[in-house]
Swiss-Prot record:
Keyword field contains Zinc-finger: no
Organism: Erwinia tasmaniensis (strain DSM 17950 / CFBP 7177 / CIP 109463 / NCPPB 4357 / Et1/99)
Classification lineage: Bacteria, Pseudomonadati, Pseudomonadota, Gammaproteobacteria, Enterobacterales
Membrane topology, from the record: Multi-pass membrane protein
Cellular component terms per the entry's GO annotation: plasma membrane
Transmembrane segments: 15-35, 50-70, 79-99, 109-129, 137-157, 168-188, 209-229, 249-269, 272-292, 299-319, 333-353, 362-382
Protein name, as recorded: Probable sugar efflux transporter
A GO term, aspect molecular function: carbohydrate transmembrane transporter activity
Localization annotation: Cell inner membrane
Amino acid sequence: MQTTPVSRKTAWLRVLMLAIAAFIFNTTEFVPVGLLSDIGSSFSMQTAQVGLMLTIYAWVVALMSLPMMLLTRNVERRMLLMIIFVMFVASHALSSVAWDFTTLLISRIGIALSHAIFWSITASLAIRVAPQGKKTQALSMMATGTALAMVLGLPIGRMIGQLLGWRITFAVIGAVAFVTMLLLLKLLPKLPSEHTGSLKSVPMLFRRPALVALYLLIAITVTAHYTAYSYIEPFIQSVAGLSGGFTTFLLLIFGAAGIVGSVLFSIYGNKFPATFLLAAIGLITLSMMCLYVSATHTLAVSTLCVIWGIAVMVMGLAVQVRVLALAPDATDVAMSLLSGIYNIGIGAGALLGGQVSLHLNMASVGYVGGAIGILSLLWCAWSMKRHPQLRLNG
């Protein structure tokens, strides 16, 4: 709840700025996917080796989300956001002047630490500053920020990287983050920490079987997705033999499809909660299984990316709403665990995709991701049967 009454316009403006912040944080997480080849060329490395930066980033977030959230649980939230942004901007400044791959990794670790705290607190903050009764819409706006990171942030970052160099991409992200920090400082009220939970909340949460089943579902599904998605740029160029410009276009429509998924979820997610989650995981799996056979057909692979992008967004929103519903008494701890587990999946998928491309071939990443996706779909169906509350959004 907000401590003082504000107009609906102001409330929505605050949510919008948090969504813009989400856009920035997700852009910097995802943009290396579109720059792997360029970064590899700068340091004379293979793309699979450069892909290690995706795994390290994700696993730093995974390992540090809960400890950083607990360490800062009593810090007033606006002040904490400012600290996060200062670390974020400084780390991007280092990325923009990185003289070797080790320096780049160090800068990415700094960004990952700020990311770890940001996603532990932001969903609950968006709900707190949103107009009364608009929780779902606030989360949907945050999700739109995430989707825009793929539809605008990632392809624009890739275009800047191709035109001016990947270092300039990181410099621009840092500059935009600095402006956003100043606007958030002006717009947000003081937000005392509340309902964060404590270290004691962790075993309590893991004694909730439905929540544990959901966390495992998230880990499996995200691992499956990122096994293929992490290497979509080199896959399209080296396996499909399509141009760099068309690769940028595919990244663009993948992200645009995520916005469609966000809108669909906000309208129909509460009406068909179980169907939406099962269908999303099924479509993610099908998309990866069909990636290789559709790769050389521009219309087919474009259609596939639209379906895949919609499904990934719906899946992400569906699990987030369920986590908040299953842990209303410790939202920040539950969300930090979600962020950590999600990033375990990102790191595992990026690592597995890299190993597949090195030891099998790049063409196989979709099939391996799809095989894990089938396991995820089976686990989802079983979990919903075993834990009926997972069939609902809350």
